[in-house]
Amino acid sequence: MKKRFVCNISTLALSLLVLPLLALSEQSGHGVQTFTGEVMDSICTPSGSHAATMAKMSGMGKDSETCTKACVALGAKYMLYDQTSHTVYSVNQQDKVARFAGHDVRITGTLAGNKIDVRDVDELG
């Protein structure tokens, strides 16, 4: 009886340690994943559109690419905006997405919180 009790306590203790780690791993999205969306900037992503920024500020251009580049020149960061889920992701490797400003892309990488560590970027369409 005592041996079974010790075994059950050990199993319970191990479960209490391992289960939160598994949940954290799932939540953080460890492992390579694929993300799709438009390479936008941190000024325009809250609205999910460049239209408001282009209407408010002159010199932002008349298309997504020009607006994104102009916002980044003002100090904004490149972001990935998933139009389907309305999710905004930060991008750790800004240089890897810069040439895709204002374009729809597929990013392969790992997710930690809402930040993508970019491995590869391909333009869609």
Language-model segments: residues:
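Positively charged n-region of N-terminal signal peptides that target proteins for export
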Residues: 1-4
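Bacterial N-terminal signal peptides
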Residues: 9-23
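Conserved RNA-binding domains used in RNP assembly and mRNA/RNA metabolism
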Residues: 24-125
